[in-house]
Amino acid sequence: MTFPISKLRVFVIAFFMMASVSVKAQQPGMQALIGQSLSKLQQPTPEAFLNSIAEMKRIDSMFPDSIQPKYQMALQSLNFSVMNPHAAQTDHLLAETEQTIAKMEQMKNSDPSDICTLRGFLFMVCIVQNPVQNGPRYYLNVMQDFEKALKLNPDNQLARQLQQKFLEGMRQQTGNQGE
C-alpha cells in the first residue's frame, strides 16, 4: 500500500518541480523572442516596424501577464507612427497603443516612469500628426508626462531623449532657435 502512495508523492513532487522550472524558463524565452524581434529593426523601415509590432503581439499573447511585450509593442507602434504620421495604419496603432498603456497602468509590476514616457510619446505623435490642431491640445500633456517620468526615474534615458527631441521640434516649429 505504501508503494502506490510513494509513487504518487514522487510524481506530484516531480510535477511541481517541472512546473516551477517551466515558469522560470518562460522569462528567458520571452526575452529571447523580444530580442530576436528587435534585432530585425536594424533597418528601421515601415515594414520592419509593422512586422516587429505583429511579433510583439504574438509574444504578448504567449506571456499575457508580462509587461515587457506590451511595452515593446507600444514603443514600436509609437516609433512607426512618429516616422509615418499619415500612414493608413497610424490611427489604428495609436488607438491600440492607448489601450495597451491603459492595460499596463493596471498591472501591479508596471513602472510608472515607463508609463509616463509612453503616454508622453503618444501625445507627441498626435502633435506630429497634426501640429496646428493637436499642438495646443497636447503640448502641456507631453511636457508633464516627460517631466513626471524623469522625476520618478532620473535615469530614464528614453524620456530624456524624447523630451529633448520634442523641445527641439517645438523650437523649430515656433522659429525660436535659441534657449
Positions of the model-derived regions?
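Amphipathic alpha-helical repeat scaffolds of TPR domains
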Residues: 27-40, 62-84, 109-130, 157-171
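Ligand-binding pocket scaffold of soluble enzyme catalytic domains
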Residues: 2-5, 107-110, 114-115, 152, ...
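Helix-turn-helix repeat elements of alpha-solenoid scaffolds
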Residues: 42-56, 89-100, 136-141
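Bacterial Sec-dependent N-terminal signal peptides
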Residues: 1-33
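Canonical positions in the second alpha-helix
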Residues: 59, 104, 148-149
